[in-house]
Design a protein with these regions (language model features):
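Short, structural beta-strand-to-alpha-helix junction motif
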Residues: 22-26, 324, 666, 761
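Short, glycine-/polar-rich solvent-exposed loops and beta-turns at beta-strand/coil boundaries
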Residues: 40-47, 69-70, 176, 784-785
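Fe-S ferredoxin-like electron-transfer domains
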Residues: 51-229, 233-237, 242-249
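A basic, amphipathic helix-loop patch mediating RNA/tRNA/ribosome contacts
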Residues: 24-58
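N-terminal leader/propeptide and maturation segments of large enzyme subunits in energy/redox metabolism
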Residues: 101-132, 138, 576, 658, ...
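Catalytic alpha/large subunits of respiratory electron-transfer oxidoreductases
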Residues: 96, 100, 148-150, 154-155, ...
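Short beta-alpha connecting loops at secondary-structure transitions
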Residues: 9-10, 73-79, 182-187, 412-420, ...
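Iron-sulfur (Fe-S) cluster-binding modules
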Residues: 1-36, 74-132, 255-258, 484, ...
């Protein structure tokens, strides 16, 4: 039965019902009818530039483009008539007039839509005898991208991607008519961190990757489904290899995670991950020099060193939060159960990991009608997430409230931006929550804001609350209205200040009290009713006026900015708070987390869906997985706190190993203890403190002074060079296993490249080492370890984990034959 909001039409004799506003192209796709396109991309607005999707519609003249024509009731569409196919053939002939016959050398050959559609619809011979357009063949338009303008068919996908998706128009259309070409602005290269995506969406070989040019043919490549190991977003990728060598990475679209895009750091950076010499056999240091050893000798030496350290003193372990869940699980079990030490952590720390459990999914950004970013700038660390937030700002008009002391990639869209005192971020978040209550009180006077003695933390006096509800970091801009039309960090976006002033005018004394609360905590600010100060020194907030006191420096989160931000969030039905886990490294980290939870609860009051509305942004690829596997001093496997005695006993029983029920040293404490001569043994799993720890001197001193240092690593890093024993492990794209992204989604990795030499899977090494410390368990594959994780830790995300992807068989290797016929 047709729904009220649906339209019924007929395409090629088949009837279909689709929602109103659906494009003819999508309606045809619903029926499984293939309509060819070049310029269409479902993530961009339709353009109708290539004219390949022309169809015939009864009672309409001409051939309208299916990609830009909405359906209508009773519409009769034909996609396969003789007239339609003749039109497509003509369009292909037109596109091929200036297109060079580069197919034998073009990197796009074999996966080229123009090539494919020409074989299917196009003419077999060209009638064009005049000279074709000629351009420089190899034009380096950016560090990673090469442009061949002769091949370009002017579909404008690349231009629209940079302008509409990235919001950075680095590619433009130049000139007009038959002189039109794609190019960059003079003196400005295509250096966007998302530039590699233009090579994926280009339907011809006009835009190619510098690193992949002339390297391989698509039919010679083996493809392995995997996950990008660069950051915690967990973008899905296909690893393309040829004869065991990495060739390129391409996106494997997962709409709920990456929206089909990749950043250049992940796309190109991981191809050259081996920055140091590769370790392919076990090494034991004797007389200051590494000597090759057998696996049995190396494991025996590792066992001896760890036993001596455990017996004689203190033992600790540091793991990489880039490791797989399987490695981290076995590492934690070895340290906690086999070696009975509570001192384990990832180098960047997983102590905040429990805060992320049960958080919002990435897809929550799509339906959010208000977003708060707390010291978070995804373009810096979780890049693809930035594109999703940009899309919401551009397409839905979402104006995020940004709490940050730095310039961020989303500042241009901000409805309000609040700075904070570096040691008191929590106060700004609490003040924002109070501002939301104040704004709601204006819309509904019965809802009184909680200020003064009703501060977010119950039991505090009004004076104490006033002292804490502040964000007094100084800035270079005086508090006051702008004269150049530009918005400063702590001002509402243009068009909001007046509306907020009107909305807040006439509020109850509670609103004035909120401004008073904020003002009293900001040094140099005075609060007074309806009183003007010197020109350029006042800011109206409706019920109150806030001005800079005499001789005071300009301050950070001004009360009017906080109130403006509160107004933006007051009516949100699907509010979302996004914070970077680095806030937990601040002195008031836990207080900030509590304030964020309070803000989440406040936003959830108008939310009809009972889902989490906080998204935590971690730093490393598998930070959340590390916390869930218990590689943190205060966190048990399963992501539960060490204080959960019932769960502690259950894990201990499952493992059959006694554990110490105490909170151990974190990464900083472990390195300090080692540097102070208080540590007798240290196990480094795929981590390099010398290069990754903020204080290199402390890291070097720590590794130099520890009596026994064991390193499990794929590379001979500066830290590994200090080790007494090195166990060679698999590297990037050589291991199978799983990673947990920042939203808690467990995704599997496929082995794309064989492990070189005598190196082994990390989980295999840890299982072998664990057997020497009473953990009697053998594993045939990483999948078996994964099943144990699911059974033991009962994490919901693991229950539906499928089989690990396998690399598809490589094409049959052919002997290369020279022109003379010899091999």
């Amino acid at each position: 039965m047709q729904q009220p909001d649906e339209v019924t039409l007929t395409i090629d004799g088949k009837e279909v019902a689709v929602p109103k506003g659906t494009l003819v192209l999508h309606a045809a796709q619903k029926l499984g009818i293939d309509v060819p396109t070049f310029c269409y991309n479902n993530k961009m607005d339709p353009l109708g530039a290539c004219r390949m999707c022309l169809v015939s519609i009864e009672k309409q003249k001409g051939f309208p483009p299916a990609c830009a024509t909405p359906v209508a009731p009773g519409m009769i569409v034909t996609t396969k008539s003789e007239a339609v196919e003749k039109t497509r053939k003509s369009m292909l002939e037109f596109l091929l007039i200036n297109h060079p016959l580069d197919c034998p050398i073009c990197d796009k050959g074999g996966e080229c839509p123009l090539q494919n559609l020409t074989f299917k619809f196009g003419p077999g011979r060209s009638r064009f005898v005049e000279n074709k357009r000629r351009f420089q063949k190899h034009l380096q338009v950016g560090p990673q991208i090469v442009l061949d303008r002769e091949r370009c068919i002017l579909c404008q996908l690349c231009v629209r991607f940079m302008e509409d998706i990235v919001d950075d128009a680095q590619l433009v259309m130049i000139n007009r008519g038959d002189s039109t070409e794609i190019g960059t602005f003079p003196g400005r290269p295509l250096d966007s961190v998302f530039s590699g995506n233009v090579t994926d969406i280009c339907p011809v070989g006009a835009l190619t990757s510098q690193s992949y040019r002339f390297q391989s043919r698509p039919w010679d490549l083996a493809h392995t489904p995997s996950v990008c190991p660069t950051c915690p977003v967990g973008c899905n990728i296909d690893v393309n290899t040829r004869r065991g060598q990495l060739m390129r990475l391409t996106p494997r679209e997962n709409i709920t995670v990456d929206d089909g895009w990749l950043c250049d750091i992940g796309r190109y950076g991981t191809l050259s991950w081996a920055r140091y010499e590769r370790v392919t056999s076990p090494l034991i240091k004797k007389n200051g020099h590494f000597l090759p050893a057998s696996w049995d000798e190396a494991l025996q030496a590792a066992e001896h060193g760890l036993r001596a350290a455990r017996t004689g003193g203190t033992l600790a372990g540091l793991a990489s939060a880039r490791g797989t869940n399987e490695e981290l699980y076995l590492f934690g079990r070895l340290l906690r159960g086999g070696l009975r030490t509570p001192h384990l952590d990832t180098l960047n720390g997983s102590r905040g990991g429990t805060a992320t459990l049960g958080g919002a999914p990435i897809a929550a950004i799509e339906d959010a009608d208000a977003i708060v970013l707390v010291d978070a700038d995804p373009i810096a660390r979780q890049m693809v997430l930035h594109l999703r937030l940009t899309k919401q700002a551009k397409r839905r008009g979402i104006q995020p409230v940004i709490i940050s002391n730095d310039d961020t990639g989303l500042d241009k869209f901000a409805g309000a931006k609040l700075s904070f005192q570096p040691t008191n971020l929590s106060a700004t978040v609490r003040a924002l929550a109070d501002a939301v209550r104040a704004a709601r009180a204006g819309l509904n006077p019965a809802a009184a804001p909680r200020t003064g003695s009703d501060d977010l933390r119950s039991g505090q006096s009004g004076a104490a609350a006033q002292t804490d509800v502040a964000a007094p970091a100084t800035s270079d801009t005086a508090a006051g209205p702008q004269t150049d039309g530009q918005r400063t960090d702590d001002q509402a976006a243009p068009g909001h200040a007046h509306g907020i002033a009107g909305a807040l005018a006439g509020l109850s004394d509670a609103v004035s009290n909120l401004a008073e609360t904020v003002t009293n905590a900001v040094p140099g600010l005075t609060h007074h009713e309806s009183q003007e100060g010197p020109a350029g020194q006042t800011a109206q907030t409706g019920a109150a006026t806030v001005s800079a006191g005499a001789g005071a420096q300009a301050t950070a989160a001004r009360p009017e900015a906080i109130l403006a931000a509160g107004q933006l969030l007051a009516t949100a039905k699907r509010g979302l708070v996004v914070y970077d886990e680095r806030v937990l490294d601040e002195p008031d980290g836990q207080a900030t987390l509590d304030a964020i939870r309070d803000l989440e609860a406040l936003l959830a009051e108008l939310d009809t869906l009972p889902t989490a509305r906080v998204l935590a942004l971690s730093k490393d690829t598998n930070s959340r997985g590390a916390a869930e596997m218990g590689v943190a001093p205060a966190v048990l496997p399963g992501g539960r706190p060490i204080s959960d005695l019932e769960w502690f006993n259950e894990v201990q029983s499952s493992w059959g190993l006694p554990m110490l029920n105490e909170t151990g040293l974190d990464a900083a404490g472990i390195l300090r203890a080692a540097a102070g001569g208080e540590l007798d043994g240290l196990f480094l799993m795929d981590t390099d403190p010398i290069m990754e720890w903020p204080d290199e001197d402390v890291a070097r001193e720590a590794l130099a002074r520890v009596p026994f240092l064991l390193a499990q690593t794929a590379l001979l890093t500066p830290s590994a060079q200090q080790a007494d024993v090195i166990l060679p492990a698999a590297g990037v794209f050589e291991e199978s296993g799983s990673l947990t992204n920042l939203e808690g989604r467990v995704q599997t990795l496929g082995r794309a490249v064989e492990i070189p030499g005598e190196a082994r899977d990390g989980w295999d090494i840890l299982a072998e080492l664990s057997n020497r410390f009473g953990v009697v368990q053998t594993y045939e594959s990483a999948a078996v370890v994964s099943q144990e994780i699911a059974d033991t830790l009962r994490l919901s995300a693991w229950q539906a984990l499928g089989q690990f992807p396998e690399r598809e068989p490589a094409p049959e290797q052919r002997e290369l034959v020279t022109a003379g016929g010899g091999a």
